[in-house]
Amino acid sequence: MIKGTGHMIVNIANDRGMSIDSIRKTIKESVLIAYKKYFGSNENAFIKFDDDTGDLSVYAKKKIVKEVKDSLLEILEKDISKENIVEGDYAYIEINPKVFDRLSIQVAKQRTKNDLQGIEDNEILSEFKSKLNKVVIGYVQQNRNGDLYVNLGNTDGIIPKKYQSPREVYNLNDKIRVLVYNVKKGKNGIEVILSRTHPKFIEELLALEIPEIEEGIIKIHKIVRDPGYRIKVAVYSEKEEIDPVGPCIGQKGVRIQSIIKELEGEKIDIIPYSKDIKEFIKDSLTPSKIEHVYILDEDLHKALVVVSDDQLSLAIGKMGQNVRLANRLLDWAIDVKTSSQFAEMKANSEFKQETLEMFDKVMQDVVEEEQFEEISKISDLKLLDPSVISNLSKEGFDDINNFLQADEGVLFNLGVSYEKQEEINKILKEGMIIIANDNDESMEKVEEDEELLCPECGVVINENMTSCPGCKIGLSFEFEEE
């Protein structure tokens, strides 16, 4: 018996978080390797762990014979000692592991080390896979090139710099809550990737602090976050009588403040989710107060929000943060305007309608293709960059009629500045046209010649034509002699 092995196995199990059975199995396999290395075979080897102490014993199973031909497998009855175990025709002779040579022991030790590491890795992998997307508690061990290494008990995890909030700073041995983001086998063992920026981390914190979320009474529609600065959480309840926001805030804000404290003061907006998109848009832009919401394109998820002048900065947020988070929460593109800006847009809209009518009238008068080139596309004006023209074409706004009827904010989002819109509108308002052949003599000739019209469509024609440039009907001319 190898005394102390039972105690050693228990210590390894406690230190590494491994099961005693898995450690015993590994040690048994390693001893069998040493046995075979020394004796040449381990077919008759028998390994036993004491029921009381857990200590290891190694036996050689030998057949009791009157004449020994193979000392490894056979034994004389007279050579069996009282300590040996006899079962029928076989005796179990205890082997002192000290008989193994150094090489056999070294091979067994290396095998044990590798196997124990493999078992430990598999158990850690299994444990943390079951904790994926869950919050665990650890202690900061070190900061290496911006990455935080966290002691999780039986292993270490790492919070890459990109998964850390810029607001948070940690010192050695600080207690920290983290989300188990990913677990995988790496070159140096199991890698446990942690995060404090993932939306799931916020969801887990909310569930820990708010029983109604944990119990499913209140549900989370979506979470968006600009780590270190602001979080927006849309919540709802399937029971109409339940206010989804109040329980999340808590009495005197105690629940939400607990989470804000955990995030080192990061702002959190709890927003009631609504299927009424206008209401949802209004609430998503909290803390600002919204006057009106206009749906510009329901299919493309585009909307215009109007706020008072003093609410614009709140609605947009610092560096556009508030409206950007709202866009992500809604999956809509929101354009925010002040009341005064919106009034100006309305005036411009009426102006565009007048311009459109005037433009149509002018173009109706321009019918002679030999003299004039009709402008039907904004791209013909050569006033916008190709990329902007491409954007307009995709939305159908390269067509002048569509352009004039388009909302000013929509055009702005496609890359046409308000100044450029004004310039284009002015050109069209003044009825400018491009003269293809502005030769004075040809113009005078048109005025002097008798005007001929196509009998089918009314387009101006002349005797040199064989077909109408308008309707393409075939032409022939007969002139009476004077």
UniProtKB/Swiss-Prot annotation:
HAMAP family: NusA_B. Signal peptide: none annotated. Keywords: Cytoplasm, RNA-binding, Transcription, Transcription antitermination, Transcription regulation, Transcription termination. It holds the Pfam family NusA_N. GO terms for biological process: DNA-templated transcription termination; transcription antitermination. Residues 300-446 form the KH domain. PROSITE patterns: S1. Monomer. Binds directly to the core enzyme of the DNA-dependent RNA polymerase and to nascent RNA. One of its GO terms (molecular function) is DNA-binding transcription factor activity. It comes from the Bacteria. One of its GO terms (cellular component) is cytosol. Belongs to the NusA family. It is found in: Cytoplasm. Participates in both transcription termination and antitermination. It comes from Borreliella burgdorferi (strain ATCC 35210 / DSM 4680 / CIP 102532 / B31) (Borrelia burgdorferi). This is Transcription termination/antitermination protein NusA. The keyword Transcription regulation applies. InterPro entries: KH_dom, KH_dom-like_a/b, KH_dom_NusA-like, KH_sf_prok-type, NA-bd_OB-fold, NusA_bac, NusA_N_sf, S1_domain. Residues 133-197 form the S1 motif domain. The keyword tRNA-binding does not apply.
